[in-house]
Amino acid sequence: MLFIQDELYKEYVKMMMNIVILCMILSISLSFWMISITASTYSGTLRPISPWRWLVSLLTPIIIVSHGIKKRSLDSSGALGGLLVGFILTIANYSFFSALLAFFFISSKLTKWRGEVKKCYDSEYKEGGQRNWVQVFCNGGLPAELALLYMIENGPGEIPIDFSKEYTASWMCLSLLGALSCSAGDTWASEIGPVLSKSAPRLITTWEKVPVGTNGGVTPIGLISSLLGGISVGVAYFVTQLVFVDDLEIAAPQWPIVIYGGMAGLLGSLIDSYLGAIMQYSGYDESTGKIVNHPTKDAKFICGKPILDNNAVNLFSSILIALLLPTAAWSFWPRL
């Protein structure tokens, strides 16, 4: 028992160190952006941020986070993290914000959906979801960092994704889209697949049948759900492009955003499942009949090693998709 507690403590310290490093990176990047935007504004290369954009970027995250607290989708620490991430994405690009909004609202609804069923197999199920700051930063930290880099490169504002004219900014836009679509795809798969699937999931590494809720378990319905989750984020991004980007008629087509969003959701879910199968512990607690993510005296081993937790797996999956998606899109994106 002491060994298990010691391992859990080491895992917690490691996770906290990763979160502290992420917060430092965000703070440093935000400082560089403020210096960059100030210098560029005074040198005449960028227009000042309009008061209207400042107002929207401040008020909108507050309204959404307040709603999240009321609906128990966020706890107090998650609300603070959500305010920071929401502000950065909103002031950077309204398309970024709409993609984040689609992910947050739909995922929150799905987390609450059929909660009585999920309690039966998930030992860590929380009523309403109640995402904390760790979950917020593991899902939104990378998009926030990409949004800051986008502002340093391009300044705040919406642009068409066009690799022939704006290569770096377009790369960052698709990278951010990939990260959010990956998170949405994984959430949709984990919230819908176990509930609607009639057959037992299969472990992605061995294709053996495993209990519902096992890390690394996949089902056809779960994979379809992950595709739809990515598409939902892509649609939100695409619609916002149509509304706020002025020069779409002379830019490359934007409809591939929806397709690449779906691809990121599906591929991200597969990567997440693979990492979960080998780097997350899954055991069946015979005393409760639920899947546990840490070794216990009553847990029967199923798969994986207790190296990462679910938040870390989500973060690594998002990073991989954020790197892969724009690289693939650059080769196949339509050009005028």
UniProtKB/Swiss-Prot annotation:
Topological relation to the membrane, as annotated: Multi-pass membrane protein
Pfam families to which the protein is assigned, alphabetical: DUF92
TM ranges: 19-39, 49-69, 86-106, 218-238, 250-270, 313-333
Question: Does the keyword field hold Cytoplasm?
Answer: no
| Taxonomic superkingdom | Eukaryota
Listed A to Z, the keywords are: Membrane, Transmembrane, Transmembrane helix
Can the keyword Zinc be found in this entry's annotation? no
User: Where is the protein situated, by its record's location annotation?
Assistant: Membrane
Residue ranges that the Swiss-Prot or TrEMBL entry lists as coiled coil: none
Gene Ontology cellular-component annotations: membrane
**PANTHER family named among the record's database cross-references:** TRANSMEMBRANE PROTEIN 19
Family under the similarity heading: Belongs to the TMEM19 family.
Kindly provide the name given to this protein in its UniProt entry.
Transmembrane protein 19
Query: Where does this protein come from, organism-wise?
Result: Xenopus laevis (African clawed frog)
Tell me the gene name.
tmem19
